[in-house]
From Swiss-Prot:
SUPFAM superfamilies recorded: Metalloproteases ('zincins'), catalytic domain
Protein name: Phosphate-regulating neutral endopeptidase PHEX
UniProt source species: Mus musculus (Mouse)
Cofactor(s) required, per the database record: Zn(2+)
Transmembrane segments: 21-37
Name of the encoding gene: Phex
EC annotation from Swiss-Prot or TrEMBL: 3.4.24.-
Entry coiled-coil feature ranges: none
Tissue: Expressed in bone, specifically in the osteoid and in osteocytes. Expressed in teeth, specifically in odontoblasts and ameloblasts. Expressed moderately by macrophages in the liver and has minimal expression in brown adipose tissue. Also expressed in suprabasal layers of the skin.
Enzyme class: hydrolase
Length: 749
């Protein structure tokens, strides 16, 4: 996975941020382009003798894009990230409604603008498929702010008046039918209804995915769920920041309950108990560093699970979650059904805690989590109260524009419908051909380095690594099935949206989402298919299918440059991303899966020990990076997989680029860009850095370090290039420079 993101919530306020950003980019780009065009037309550029220059409009555009991002006053050998990105960051301040901002969010915003234009078109019964009509109606209902304001909290209060959603803190304040009864409270019924009807996983996460050791089969899995705060440590630590986050959460819970009709003193009392319970849950959660693939693979049948943790009716829970009206073939789920219990100790501790807790506190917590998830769908008074909470935990000061919130919601609710709408207009099929070139170049580079430069892996393990590399399956653009209108229409046939009932529409999508993964239970894993949303601005590796995936949303400038632009730009940007995803198959987790996607020990003991020894170098390197904005050091162990992928991907893409020069241009360098003095190798590294230009608010920086899988962007860039001798050659970095680690350089692949 490539992108870094800050925490966001679906809230909205109409602003002209998109227009301001577009206008600033247009003016800035026009000025730079105009200057370069004038210099070229007047012959005022000082070209090197006998050096070929590209003067096509695309090359002038590329030169302008590069110059708008760099800061030439910074020494690239001391801080390459600042050299490459300072210009972009200074010209693109973080929007007030975002916790961080960078080239990834910038491209995401541009995709959202395109989706907005598509969804705002009037419904055509003749031209639009049934699924597209539903997407447009859903968007229209989300944009119907007048109806949302008129409804206010009524749709949510309607739910809270019915079992199992009655919220004890509200007492009788929303009517006698809303009074919670301890005698009637059922933990199983509440958890199952939340998961089966609203896709809310509280305490327990139940889902279907491939069996790690039999990857052709789907299996039920049980895991720990999330918390109200993104960072588990914020419930446990006594730092100033953690305390302020807990205080903000507590006040938010109290105020939300009061907005829904609770008595203030009752809300303050009850929510203190709720917070104490959530702290207890945070204490027993399995931390990231202990969540290894081997540790989380605990396969057993439901009968064995019930014997291990008898305090909960696991079979009853699973049967209540799954809607057998949709999946009648699952009616026979019984004690012999296999499940993978990813966190047995967590579940043992969970039911010990719940067994000693007051039912009222448990009910208050469960319903709070449901209410919290629905706040984005309520009126402005709830949105503004959430914004006060967000100011503390994210640093944002305004709400997202309503259209942006709505686009994000529709995209997540109906990904394949929106995906088809997008690719029909904005995806060029010839991109697949160039992506195949990049992918095969990276595959060759990985295998070539494995054969010629890897001296620590024994022959048998190396042979199996080559087999896995050759077996990696690439998916580009979009899944073919989204073009089948009959299939997509049939998939959504039970959904009936109303333009005047946004909240009701949301509940329908939640039910659809809640039941969707159970479709796969008892079915074989389609190893050649993929199910990624085409509008996603990110890329992925799937260990269970040994696939690398590049959705259409990612394949745009400045990630993917077409054939009219220098190849150095594409190889440095999307090429490194291809290498990054490819290398995930051989990182500290991906390496445990064989070429068929099975969790299988295919490494020799000797090679595995040498791999682990070499990872220590990278763990130490990144752990020594201190991020002043976050006030924390990078977690080198937590980010190890992504750091391995960054370093390997950079080497593979550069090697593939040089092979392309040798094969396609007989070793002759590409024409240079006009008006700038960068060589093609330098452009490669600049393009690598440019897609990672990003800035953060302190709150988002702290969260990125605490729970992010990636190192912060500046350390992703500087960390990888400082380990790579080809970068040091390209920029003539002396041995004692910061970007030249020399003998201290780390390398696995």
């Amino acid at each position: 996975m490539e992108a870094e993101t800050g925490s966001t919530m679906e809230t909205g306020k109409g602003t002209n941020r998109g227009i301001r950003i577009a206008l600033a980019l247009f003016i800035g780009g026009t000025l730079v382009l105009g200057t370069l065009l004038f210099l070229v037309s007047q012959g005022l550029l000082s070209f090197q003798a006998k050096q070929e220059y590209c003067l096509k409009p695309e090359c002038i555009e590329a030169a302008a894009a590069i110059m708008s991002k760099v800061n030439l006053s910074v020494d690239p050998c001391e801080n390459f990230f600042r050299f490459a990105c300072d210009g972009w960051i200074s010209n693109n301040p973080i929007p007030e409604d975002m916790p961080s901002y960078g080239v990834y969010p910038w491209l995401r915003h541009n995709v959202d603008l395109k989706l907005k234009a598509l969804l705002e078109k009037s419904v055509s019964r003749r031209r639009d498929t049934e699924a597209v009509q539903k997407a447009k109606i859903l968007y229209s209902s989300c944009m119907n702010e007048k109806a949302i304001e008129k409804a206010d909290a009524k749709p949510l209060l309607h739910i809270l008046r019915h079992s199992p959603f009655r919220w004890p803190v509200l007492e009788a304040n929303i009517g006698p039918e809303g009074v919670w009864s301890e005698r009637k409270f059922s933990l199983l019924q509440t958890l199952a209804t939340f998961r089966g009807q609203y896709s809310n996983s509280v305490f327990i996460r139940l889902y279907v995915s491939p069996d790690d050791k039999a990857s052709n089969e789907h299996i039920l899995k049980l895991d720990q769920a999330t918390l109200s705060l993104a960072v588990r440590e914020d419930f446990l630590d006594n730092t100033t920041e953690a305390k302020s986050y807990r205080d903000a959460l507590y006040k938010f819970m109290v105020d939300t309950a009061v907005l829904l009709g609770a008595n203030s003193s009752r809300a303050e009392h009850d929510m203190k108990s709720v917070l104490r319970l959530e702290i207890k849950i945070a204490e027993i959660m399995i931390p990231h560093e202990n969540r290894t693939s081997e540790a989380m693979y605990n396969k057993m049948n439901i009968s064995e699970l019930s014997a291990m943790i008898p305090q909960f009716d696991w079979l009853g829970y699973i049967k209540k979650v799954i809607d057998t009206r949709l999946y009648p073939h699952l009616k026979d789920i019984g004690p012999s059904e296999n499940v993978v219990v990813r966190v047995p100790q967590y579940f043992k501790d969970l039911f010990r805690i719940l067994g000693a807790e007051r039912k009222k506190t448990i009910a208050n917590y469960l319903v709070w989590r449901m209410v919290y998830s629905r706040i984005p769908n309520l009126s402005r008074r709830f949105q503004y109260r959430w914004l006060e909470f967000s100011r503390v935990i994210q640093g944002t000061t305004t709400l997202l524009p309503q259209w942006d919130k709505c686009v994000n919601f529709i995209e997540s609710a109906l990904p394949y419908v929106v995906g088809k709408m997008f690719v029909n207009v904005h995806f060029q099929e010839d991109k697949k051909e160039m992506m195949e070139e990049l992918i095969e170049g990276v595959r060759w580079a990985f295998i070539d380095m494995l054969e010629k430069e890897n001296e620590w892996m024994d022959a048998g393990t190396k042979r199996k690594a080559q087999e896995k590399a050759r077996a990696v399956l690439a998916k580009v653009g979009y899944p073919e099935f989204i073009m089948n209108d009959t299939y997509v229409n049939e998939d959504l046939k039970a959904i009936k949206f109303s333009e005047s009932d946004y909240f009701g529409n949301v509940l329908q999508t939640r039910k659809y989402l809640a039941q969707s993964d159970f479709f796969w239970l008892r079915k074989a894993v389609p190893k050649t298919e993929w199910f990624t949303n085409p509008t996603t601005v990110n890329a992925f590796y799937s260990a269970s299918t040994n696939q690398i995936r590049f959705p259409a949303g990612e394949l745009q400038k400045p990630f993917f440059w077409g054939t009219e632009y220098p190849r150095s730009l594409s190889y440095g940007a999307i090429g490194v991303i291809v290498g990054h995803e490819f290398t995930h198959g051989f990182d500290n987790n991906g390496r445990k899966y064989d070429k068929n996607g099975n969790l299988d020990p295919w490494w020799s003991v000797e090679s595995e020990e040498k791999f682990k020894e070499k990872t220590k170098c990278m763990i130490n390197q990144y752990s020594n990076y201190y991020w002043k904005k976050a006030g924390l050091n990078v977690k080198g162990k937590r980010t190890l997989g992504e750091n391995i992928a960054d370093n390997g991907g950079l080497r593979e893409a550069f090697r593939a680029y040089r092979k392309w020069i040798n094969d396609r241009r007989q070793g002759v360098e590409e024409p240079l860009l006009p008006g700038i003095t960068f060589t093609n190798n330098q452009l490669f590294f600049l393009s690598y850095a440019h897609v990672r230009c990003n800035s953060y608010r302190p709150e988002a920086a702290r969260e990125q370090v605490q729970i992010g899988a990636h190192s912060p962007p500046q350390f992703r860039v500087n960390g990888a290039i400082s380990n790579f001798e080809e970068f040091q050659k390209a920029f003539n970095c002396p041995r004692n420079s910061t970007m030249n680690r020399g003998a201290d350089s780390c390398r696995l692949w």
